[in-house]
């Protein structure tokens, strides 16, 4: 018996959700960050024209054993979140923070090295030397949260807000950043599952 009209799209959507769930089970996660960053990536990717690639808010890189998201707000601040099977690595760079060595009177590599102290060398090497230099805070989660704060300075943890721990924060940001109103049900579905069918995504980015 052929599937009911629209059934094919539902099957594709279900398959996408199942694959995303499988990824979430494969990789270490913290506060559903993987789900929420993927939702932001899907939305930003759909709303960014190819010719405006340099204006993307978030980029995604994936290998067989790692998923990495880089959020760049265009104002000099970056949040990089890297998911592996055993840890979540979170690197923040808040350019106005006093721990920004590029703005320091004298470069102090020891400050940066201290942020990564205690992290397995293999994990540390997932970032290049240049990437590590662009750090004002570093957190890793392996079942427990680790952060080496420098003199009580959190290094700009406000950047973690881009992982949107509540739908309300995600919705407010999306509305303000993209300057448009979204269908609330579809946007909530995207936030909850990090996936929409092509038809749903097309409808979402048309706004209301």
Task: Label every model-predicted segment.
Residues 93-100:
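Short, solvent-exposed aromatic-acidic interface loops
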Residues 88-89:
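Alpha-helical solenoid scaffolds in large eukaryotic transport, assembly, and signaling factors
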Residues 2-3:
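Intrinsically disordered, low-complexity segments enriched in serine/proline and basic residues
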Residues 6-76, 85, 100-208:
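N-terminal domain-onset segments
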């Amino acid at each position: 018996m052929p599937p009911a009209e629209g059934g094919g799209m539902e099957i594709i959507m279900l398959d996408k959700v199942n694959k995303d769930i499988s990824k979430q089970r494969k990789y270490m996660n913290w506060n559903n960050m993987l789900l929420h960053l993927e939702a932001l990536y899907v939305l930003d990717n759909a709303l960014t024209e190819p010719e405006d690639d340099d204006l993307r808010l978030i980029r995604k890189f994936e290998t067989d054993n790692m998923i990495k998201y880089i959020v760049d707000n265009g104002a000099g601040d970056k949040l990089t979140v890297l998911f592996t099977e055993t840890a979540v690595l979170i690197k923040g760079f808040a350019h106005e923070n006093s721990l920004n060595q590029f703005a320091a009177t004298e470069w102090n590599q020891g400050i940066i090295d201290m942020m990564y102290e205690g992290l397995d060398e293999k994990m540390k090497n997932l970032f290049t030397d240049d990437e590590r230099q662009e750090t004002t805070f570093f957190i890793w989660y392996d079942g427990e949260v680790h952060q080496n704060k420098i003199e009580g300075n959190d290094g700009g943890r406000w950047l973690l807000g881009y992982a949107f721990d509540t739908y309300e924060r995600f919705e407010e940001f999306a509305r303000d950043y993209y300057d448009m109103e979204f269908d609330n049900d579809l946007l909530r579905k995207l936030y909850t599952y990090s996936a929409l069918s092509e038809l749903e995504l097309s409808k979402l980015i048309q706004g209301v």
